[in-house]
Amino acid sequence: MGIQISLPMMAFLVFMTGFAGFVDSAAGGGGLISLPAYLFAGLPPHYTYATNKFSAACGTTFATASFFKNGAMNLKVGILAAIGSFAGSALGAHIVLMLSDEVLQMMMFIILPIAAVVILWRRNLPDENRDDGTLNLKKALLALGIGFGIGLYDGMVGPGTGTFAIIAFTSLMGFDLRTANGNAKVLNLASNYASLFTYLSSGLVVFPVGIPCAISNIVGNIIGSHFALRKGAKFIRPMMLVVLVLLLGKLVSDAVL
């Protein structure tokens, strides 16, 4: 499919995907910025999903490396969650390929209000680490379950995935915000690549658009992860509220337009 993007629109996309990478690395939810941007630029929904996954996967790779380098994650839990996330996201992406553009848009409109309520309800997350450092069968299954559920959501819908992962790791597993964010990065990385492999095999990634956006997303992720690691909860909490505002804004725009 030949997709033409004007130079000013390409510049807009590069800026927006860079900002999306910044937000995503700090608190998740970068897709709330990048997905509407791709759609606004004129990419059809399936191509938007695929190209967004390409740029997001590239950026998340660098953010995950930053959190790993700084020891801001529980690697065992993160890997288990990533395994579940990879399976869930691959399944979700295959389901998306079977749906029409109209169904995808309707699905977003139904699911995003629920997502907004969840984020608003859990906006005041604890910052103390209540995890005892052990990994038993219950925790392992919980990590796999969190990964699969959020991965399925990411493969089918996407926006807010990192934020939901942070909420799950703090609320259900007792991690502080910094560690939960690191675990979320590992989960999200696996989810992004699982979906991306599915979209690549279907030829849906628009590389002339995706490559410059991926570079911008990488830069945004590097800067955002730097701030999140240095500032911790003081930076992550406000960014999560920014994600909530963006999510609610998207809901309003979908309802009006």
What are these regions (language model features)?
Residues 40, 93, 97, 106, ...:
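Transmembrane helix-loop junction
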Residues 62-72, 109-135, 248-257:
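Transmembrane helix exit motif
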Residues 14, 18, 22, 53, ...:
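Residue-level signature of the transmembrane alpha-helical core
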Residues 46-50, 181-185:
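Small-residue hotspots at the loop-to-helix junctions and early N-terminal turns
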Residues 147-157, 195-203, 210, 247-257:
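Hydrophobic alpha-helical transmembrane segments in multi-pass integral membrane proteins
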Residues 1-44, 130-181:
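Selected transmembrane alpha-helices and immediately adjacent juxtamembrane segments
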Residues 50-103, 107-110, 192-242:
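Selective hydrophobic functional segments
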Residues 10, 53, 108-112, 116, ...:
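Residues within membrane-spanning alpha-helices of integral membrane proteins
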